[in-house]
Structures are given as C-alpha cells and as structure tokens.
C-alpha cells in the first residue's frame, strides 16, 4: 500500500464534475453525505494510511480497533477515491430511494463496520490454514468492501438483465462474483479479501440473518427513543407501509403507491426512471427560470399524479 503523493487531484476533480453533472439536488442526502465525508477524509486524513488501514496484526493482536472505523473512510490516492465514490454515487441513488434515507444510512454504517470484521476473519483463517503469518499483516484501506456489499443488494432488488464485464455478458445476479475475479486479475494490488468480505456481508443481508438482526436492533432503539410521528416497516423488498400522520393524528398510509406502482412509473424500470428524471431535470433547468426543487420536496399525492401523467402524455 503506497502513500499518496501531493499534487493536482485529477480524480477528485473528475468526481466533482460527475456530481455537478448529475445535480446535487438529484442526489439523495445520505448518498451525498457519504461522498462528502469520504472526500473530507481524503483532503484531511484523520491519520496516515499506515495507521488507518486494517489488518489482523494491528486490529486483533495490537487491539487497535478504531481502524475498523477509519479504514473505510481513507483512500490511497485520488483515483482510488474517484472510482469508489462514482460507484457509490450510482448505487446510492438507486438504493437510497428504494430503502429510504434513514434505513440506507443504517445499512451504510452497518456494512462499513461488518466488512472490516469479516475481512479480519478471512485473513486470520487463511493465515492459519496455510500457515502463512504474512496474511495477518496485510493492511487494507478504502470503501470498496462496502460497495461490493451494496452491489449484492442492488442485484438482489434488480435480478434481471446482464452487465458487460471485460467484454462478456454476465447475468446481474452473478455480476459481483465476476467483478471480484476480474478486478483481482486486472489490478493485482487490490484487496481480494476486502472485496470478498463485502460480498459476504451483502449475502448475509439478502440471504442470511443480518437484516432481521438489524430490524430487531432498530426496533429496540425506536422503543427506547419513544413514539414519533413516522414509522417505517421493512421487508426483504425494501420499505413498505410507510406511514405518516396529519396534524390531528389521522394516519396517512402509502401502501397504495406500491400496489399501483405502474401508474406512477409508466412501467419503466428503476434505471429508466432515473435516466428520465435526470433528463427532465436538465430540461427544466434550461427552460425555466426557477431552480429545481430540493431533494425531499413533496407535492400532494393528487398533484404529483397529475403532473406525472401530464408529462407521460406529452411524450
């Protein structure tokens, strides 16, 4: 692992151009905050890379557990940051809008911690099985493990279709495994164990007990925090039964939005909806004097339905 050099951060400039090309108001808040935190730690590292990376030797044997928190937020150089954050940008836009901002923030925090723990377990196991203590000294840093976990979630929610990896079409459900192997052979300096740890954490969420454990912990926290005006109920397909309340206490339930989803999406996939929304935002900027609505601005349901149907009828 090399220490980054000072100079023009071309990767950082490209990342900023990507963000402004999409539009800050089109990026959900937790995704945007995750990008901002990673960029801030890149420009103002909490500790040098050698003191923030994770390894069995440093974390387990020397009890330096704070590295589990620091390692996902530090990157080797501006290109390492760029590729990770561009990937985070597109995964975050899709997943945060599906899961909701609070749950997505919970997922990011949990995955950031667990990928480090699983990485240490993998390195320790390999070192013991092969009798190679050098594996205990391998030090990893970066957000890519979390991204592989999010990749598993994205493929779980959108299992159909193919992606092109090194010129070969690969089904979405196997894409993370193909990328794991491809990155390892094309870029030998990357952490194979770190990426594998991310995949395993993602599978623990989609196929294992992790999501139920997170649901239970969230329920305990909410019960201790007391009643609130909003309740979120989650299942394996994301949020359902989102409930809000009027000022007089009457509940407003949005289950019908999910049952009549095609009315709002015109039958488009998530990727097509995202592309159309970005194009519409760009068109609105060029043809109106008013700026785009901030993220999270909510129209009344009937007004939203009227505007969307009017837009689709005009195309």
From Swiss-Prot:
EC number in record: 3.4.21.105
Tissue expr: Expressed in testis (at protein level). Expressed in intestine, lung, brain, kidney, epididymis, stomach, muscle, spleen, liver, heart and testis.
Assigned GO CC terms: endoplasmic reticulum membrane; endoplasmic reticulum quality control compartment; mitochondrial membrane
Residue stretches spanning the membrane: 22-42, 104-124, 138-154, 181-201
SUPFAM superfamilies per the UniProt record, alphabetical: Rhomboid-like
GO molecular function terms attached to this record: endopeptidase activity; peptidase activity; serine-type endopeptidase activity
Topological domain ranges for the Cytoplasmic compartment: 1-21, 125-137, 202-315
GO biological process, one term: cellular response to unfolded protein
Activity modulation: Inhibited by aprotinin.
Region (VCP/p97-interacting motif (VIM)): 301-315
Gene3D superfamilies: Rhomboid-like (1.20.1540.10)
Localization per record: Endoplasmic reticulum membrane; Mitochondrion membrane
Active site (catalytic residues): 144, 195
Coiled coil: none
Region: Ubiquitin-binding domain (UBD), residue numbers: 269-284
Name of the protein described by the UniProt record: Rhomboid-related protein 4
Its job: Intramembrane-cleaving serine protease that cleaves single transmembrane or multi-pass membrane proteins in the hydrophobic plane of the membrane, luminal loops and juxtamembrane regions. Involved in regulated intramembrane proteolysis and the subsequent release of functional polypeptides from their membrane anchors. Functional component of endoplasmic reticulum-associated degradation (ERAD) for misfolded membrane proteins. Required for the degradation process of some specific misfolded endoplasmic reticulum (ER) luminal proteins.
Catalysed reactions listed for this entry: Cleaves type-1 transmembrane domains using a catalytic dyad composed of serine and histidine that are contributed by different transmembrane domains
Ranges of the Lumenal topological domain: 43-103, 155-180
Subunit structure: Interacts with BIK and STEAP3. Interacts (via C-terminal domain) with VCP/P97. Interacts with ubiquitin and ubiquitinated proteins.
Record key words, sorted: Apoptosis, Differentiation, Endoplasmic reticulum, Hydrolase, Membrane, Mitochondrion, Protease, Serine protease, Spermatogenesis, Transmembrane, Transmembrane helix
Enzyme class: hydrolase
């Amino acid at each position: 692992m090399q220490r980054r050099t000072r100079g023009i951060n071309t990767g950082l400039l490209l990342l900023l151009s990507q963000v402004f090309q999409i539009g800050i108001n089109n990026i959900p808040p937790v995704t945007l905050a995750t990008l901002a935190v990673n960029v801030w730690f890149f420009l103002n590292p909490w500790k040098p890379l050698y003191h923030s990376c994770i390894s069995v030797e440093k974390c387990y044997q020397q009890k330096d557990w704070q590295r589990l928190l620091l390692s996902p937020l530090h990157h080797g150089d501006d290109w390492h940051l760029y590729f990770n954050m561009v990937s985070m940008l597109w995964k975050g836009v899709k997943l945060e809008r599906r899961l909701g901002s609070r749950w997505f923030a919970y997922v990011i925090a949990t995955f950031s911690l667990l990928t480090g723990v699983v990485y240490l377990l993998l390195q320790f196991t390999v070192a013991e099985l092969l009798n190679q203590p050098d594996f205990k000294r391998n030090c990893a840093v970066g957000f890519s493990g979390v991204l592989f976990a999010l990749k598993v979630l994205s493929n779980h929610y959108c299992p159909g279709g193919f992606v092109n990896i090194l010129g070969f079409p690969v089904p979405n459900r196997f894409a993370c495994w193909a990328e794991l192997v491809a990155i390892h052979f094309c870029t030998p300096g990357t952490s194979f164990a770190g990426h594998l740890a991310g995949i395993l954490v993602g599978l623990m969420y989609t196929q294992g007990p992790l999501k139920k454990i997170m649901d239970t912990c969230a329920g305990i926290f909410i019960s201790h925090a007391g009643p609130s005006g909003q309740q979120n109920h989650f299942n394996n397909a994301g949020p359902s039964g989102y409930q809000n309340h009027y000022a007089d206490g009457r509940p407003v339930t949005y289950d019908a939005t999910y049952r009549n989803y095609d009315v709002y999406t015109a039958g488009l996939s998530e990727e097509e909806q995202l592309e159309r929304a970005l194009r519409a935002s760009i068109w609105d900027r060029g043809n109106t004097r008013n700026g785009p609505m901030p993220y999270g601005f909510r129209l009344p349901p009937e007004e939203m339905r009227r505007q969307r149907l009017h837009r689709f009828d005009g195309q």
